[in-house]
Amino acid sequence: METSTSSSQSLIPLPMSKKDYSSEIICAFDIGAKNPARTVLEVKDNSVRVLDISKLDWSSDWERRIAQDLSQYEYTTVLLERQPRRSPYVKFIYFIKGFLYHTSAAKVICVSPVMSGNSYRDRKKRSVEAFLDWMDTFGLRDSVPDRRKLDDVADSFNLAMRYVLDKWNTNYTPYNRCKYRNYIKKM
């Protein structure tokens, strides 16, 4: 099952074609077999535009499906969530790196998950909260499907937004490393 949210809305609306070389196209993957997710953002002239947020399915025929997902845009940067050494999902990372090595000028970067500290459940909850806050900011909250399992798309979106904000040297509180036991989101 593949669901997708695409939008031409941004903080500052700008017309854009698929091959606009003055912009940067950032793709972030939350890796997994049953619930991988992809976010594609365009960064141009200090504005960010959400091009696509998709929940993907790589459970069968994963090589063809990943190749299809990678061929939809001309990315300048591809972000992959770092996996533990013996994870069964490491094969996806190597496949993506190999696929883009000769076919694209995109940089492929493995990054740590955005949320850290506390329990797995707490990290996922904070990730979804930050994602929904960003969807409100972009005016896309109505496009987000009502479902319980939003943490995969939230993680991919937060990977992409953290990358953009780091490039702009912008601090966003939910993305800060939190060592406190009782993290309370204050915005």
Swiss-Prot record:
What GO biological process, any one, is recorded here?
DNA recombination
Q: Name one GO molecular function term.
A: four-way junction DNA binding
> What are its E.C. numbers?
3.1.-.-
Q: What class of enzyme is it?
A: hydrolase
SUPFAM superfamilies noted in UniProt: Ribonuclease H-like
Which cofactor does the UniProt annotation name? Mg(2+)
The reply to whether Transport figures as a keyword in the UniProt entry is no
Role: Plays a role in DNA replication by cleaving viral DNA concatamers to yield unit-length viral genomes. The concatamer junctions contain inverted repeat sequences that can be extruded as cruciforms, yielding Holliday junctions that A22 protein cleaves.
Q: Which family does it belong to?
A: Belongs to the RuvC family. Poxviruses-type subfamily.
Which protein are we looking at? Resolvase OPG149
Source organism = Monkeypox virus
